A protein has these predicted regions:
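Conserved N-terminal entry element of GNAT/NAT acetyltransferase domains
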Residues: 1-19
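Conserved GNAT-fold acetyl-CoA-binding loop/helix
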Residues: 32-54
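A short helix-loop-beta-strand connector motif used in the catalytic cores of GNAT acetyltransferases and
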Residues: 53-67
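Conserved acetyl-CoA pyrophosphate-binding loop and the N-cap/start of the following alpha-helix
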Residues: 102, 106-114
Length: 120
């Protein structure tokens, strides 16, 4: 599945690919506070590329899924998921990131509780 509508948030979700690098870069820059805290560096195009490409060396790229969440045609969130990591049958959520204007409103918790990720 590459597109999912989450009506109760007016979000659209889709799997992100390299073509969305500019939008993901914009989100990473908007979330610089998070990246400063976690990685001691600002969000950037490099950060966006890492979200799309980096994974454990023994994990095929086909086992990495990056969901993007859009609201009003703007990328406002991302979820990075690794399938069969750290071992077969396990799904690992390595990042759930929302733009600053959406934080603190329960969106992350509601997305998690809605089991959006089960629709993959």
């Amino acid at each position: 599945m590459s597109f999912l509508e989450i009506d109760f948030f007016q979000f659209h979700a889709r799997i992100l690919k390299e073509a969305e690098l500019p939008q993901l870069t914009e989100l990473c820059i908007a979330c610089t506070d998070f990246f400063q805290l976690v990685e001691q560096q600002p969000g950037s195009e490099k950060t966006a590329r890492e979200i799309l490409q980096e994974r454990p060396s023994n994990l095929p790229i086909s086992h990495k899924i990056v969901w993007g969440f859009e609201k009003d045609f703007k990328l406002v969130g991302v979820v990075e998921i690794l399938r069969d990591y750290p071992h077969s049958g396990v799904w690992y959520v390595s990042l759930l990131l929302l733009s600053p204007e959406l934080r603190g409103n329960g969106y992350g918790k509601k997305l998690w509780e809605a089991k959006v990720f089960n629709s993959i």
